[in-house]
């Protein structure tokens, strides 16, 4: 029987990382709520909330506490991770939620403690009497003891995995799963697939800049268009001058590279700057010099176009 109880406890034991993640989620939610709340007062007088900031924060945290721990026995972070609080003082092995007094004292220790810490500094700053100085020293001493106790509790939590905060230990509440957790088999198929695709993507990112796109495009166009031989007549230049050998459009600022084909200035210049070994995609002639076209085209041909 004892071994079964121990196995049941170990199966329902919440991981340390899950409890710490729940605390971080709670802090993130508080920051989000406060930032959204302050956005509502941007049009008001500057510093309106600064005077009553501790009280406003306390009211917001009480509102969150009312609809999380008080009603659902779990914080927002715990609800996301399928965790809730259990009364550790209960002798019953079944789940026993925290009592009403434990919930109220949880709010007093967390919300009231933070409010008192923020307000007492303002109180001591505005009063410089000797009696207030002694009270301030006592408060600082108590705060130091609480921080030391929190550190010791955290070290014990790392060792035993129970009571993530000092408040939980003092009130006797700890985190348990909402539903019994089954032992899951870890599969690495998805991870292996992701690693494979990430490796392939990194390989493409490394390889693509090394590919000369302009040269590849010219090579493909030379394969698709049959190579032309030497010019058979004097009219070859005029006939080929109706379209750019690269873009296939009417040549803008027509230039030649030393063969009978005509190019737009931008097409030829950009291709030559991108690849110093640029050749004509139609006849394979290497670039000797980029010269403007000097031969004229009959106006009848222009009108026919």
From Swiss-Prot:
Q: How is it modified after translation?
A: Forms intramolecular and intermolecular disulfide bonds in response to reactive oxygen species (ROS), promoting higher stability.
Question: Which reaction(s) does its UniProt entry say it catalyses?
Answer: [E2 ubiquitin-conjugating enzyme]-S-ubiquitinyl-L-cysteine + [acceptor protein]-L-cysteine = [E2 ubiquitin-conjugating enzyme]-L-cysteine + [acceptor protein]-S-ubiquitinyl-L-cysteine; S-ubiquitinyl-[E2 ubiquitin-conjugating enzyme]-L-cysteine + [acceptor protein]-L-lysine = [E2 ubiquitin-conjugating enzyme]-L-cysteine + N(6)-ubiquitinyl-[acceptor protein]-L-lysine
Key words, A-Z: Acetylation, Disease variant, Disulfide bond, Membrane, Metal-binding, Peroxisome, Peroxisome biogenesis, Peroxisome biogenesis disorder, Protein transport, Transferase, Transmembrane, Transmembrane helix, Transport, Ubl conjugation pathway, Zellweger syndrome, Zinc, Zinc-finger
Q: Which Gene3D superfamilies match?
A: Zinc/RING finger domain, C3HC4 (zinc finger) (3.30.40.10)
Enzyme Commission number: 2.3.2.27, 2.3.2.36
- Described purpose of this protein according to its UniProt entry: E3 ubiquitin-protein ligase component of a retrotranslocation channel required for peroxisome organization by mediating export of the PEX5 receptor from peroxisomes to the cytosol, thereby promoting PEX5 recycling. The retrotranslocation channel is composed of PEX2, PEX10 and PEX12; each subunit contributing transmembrane segments that coassemble into an open channel that specifically allows the passage of PEX5 through the peroxisomal membrane. PEX2 also regulates peroxisome organization by acting as a E3 ubiquitin-protein ligase.
Q: How does it assemble?
A: Component of the PEX2-PEX10-PEX12 retrotranslocation channel, composed of PEX2, PEX10 and PEX12.
The entry's free-text remark on domains says: The three subunits of the retrotranslocation channel (PEX2, PEX10 and PEX12) coassemble in the membrane into a channel with an open 10 Angstrom pore. The RING-type zinc-fingers that catalyze PEX5 receptor ubiquitination are positioned above the pore on the cytosolic side of the complex.
Name of this protein: Peroxisome biogenesis factor 2
Identify the species of origin: Homo sapiens (Human)
């Amino acid at each position: 029987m004892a071994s079964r109880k121990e196995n049941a406890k170990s199966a329902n034991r919440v991981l340390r990382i899950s409890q710490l993640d729940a605390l971080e989620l709670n802090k993130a939610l508080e920051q989000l709520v406060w930032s959204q709340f302050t956005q509502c007062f941007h049009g008001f007088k500057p510093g309106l909330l600064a005077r009553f900031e501790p009280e406003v924060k306390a009211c917001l945290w009480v509102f969150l506490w009312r609809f999380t721990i008080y009603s659902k026995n779990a914080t927002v972070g715990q609800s996301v991770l399928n965790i809730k609080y259990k009364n550790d003082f209960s002798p019953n092995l079944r789940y026993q939620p925290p009592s009403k007094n434990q919930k109220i004292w949880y709010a007093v220790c967390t919300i009231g403690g933070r409010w008192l810490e923020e307000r007492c500094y303002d109180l001591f700053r505005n009063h410089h009497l000797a009696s207030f100085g002694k009270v301030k020293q006592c408060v600082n001493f108590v705060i130091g003891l609480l921080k030391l106790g929190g550190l010791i509790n955290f070290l014990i939590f790392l060792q035993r995995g129970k009571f993530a905060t000092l408040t939980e230990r003092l009130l006797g509440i700890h985190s348990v799963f909402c539903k019994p957790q089954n032992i899951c088999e870890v599969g690495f198929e998805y991870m292996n697939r992701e690693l494979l695709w990430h490796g392939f993507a990194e390989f493409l990112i490394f390889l693509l800049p090394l590919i000369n796109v302009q040269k590849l495009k010219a090579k493909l166009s030379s394969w698709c268009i049959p190579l032309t031989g030497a010019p058979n007549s004097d009219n070859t230049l005029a006939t080929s001058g109706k379209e750019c050998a690269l873009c296939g459009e009417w040549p803008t600022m027509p230039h030649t590279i030393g063969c009978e084909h005509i190019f737009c200035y931008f097409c030829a210049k950009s291709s030559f700057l991108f690849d110093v070994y640029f050749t004509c995609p139609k006849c394979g002639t290497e670039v000797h010099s980029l010269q403007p076209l000097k031969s004229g085209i009959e106006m009848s041909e222009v009108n026919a176009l």
